[in-house]
């Protein structure tokens, strides 16, 4: 399995969509996690992996939590994510949003 270097996260009420890529930008993981499993999953990420999420109220909580674990976190402004989302992805859904956040980071 390729080593994950960057993760895009779309936060929702009950689940968190993750889109992880390797150093070449190839998708390694694209799946949903229950909110309760997200922190456990992030703890297993390789050192130096970047976790990016669209800036919103819940993102600040997760950013603080992950940074306390030594994980590099980047909050991406929503207008920047929209620009990537519009580049050929059809429709707005959690998977497309997570991929757009990953690319924008």
State where each predicted segment sits.
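Phosphate- and other anionic-substrate recognition elements at nucleic-acid/protein interfaces
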Residues: 1-105
